[in-house]
Amino acid sequence: MNGQNIRIRLKAFDHRILDASTREIVSTAKRTGASVRGPVPLPTRIEKFTVNRSPHVDKKSREQFEMRTHKRLLDIVDPTPQTVDALMKLDLAAGVDVEIKL
């Protein structure tokens, strides 16, 4: 794959699982002879939800919940066919969303 890059974008709610998956991808790519740029930590998206604590009274009593989406970006430079095969066979954690662009 001459002059081609693979861009991998990872998303997860738990940053520990995300970092472990990132380390696994980086080690697999380096083992097969490709060079890796990253991981680049992208901004964390924080969604906040405010709800009433009580079902019908006490408007002033509220509770807040938040959902954090952590993201990482990896670039694999000049991947070999072995790199692509190894990445396809890689089994990552269940809570990690992977987007791959060639």
Swiss-Prot record:
Q: Which keywords does this Swiss-Prot/TrEMBL entry list? A: Ribonucleoprotein, Ribosomal protein
Segments spanning the bilayer are none
UniProt record, GO biological process:
translation
User: Ribonucleoprotein: present as a keyword of the record?
Assistant: yes
Q: Would the keyword Transferase turn up in this protein's UniProt record? A: no
| Family recorded in the similarity comment | Belongs to the universal ribosomal protein uS10 family.
Function field: Involved in the binding of tRNA to the ribosomes.
The protein in question is named Small ribosomal subunit protein uS10
Q: Which gene encodes it?
A: rpsJ
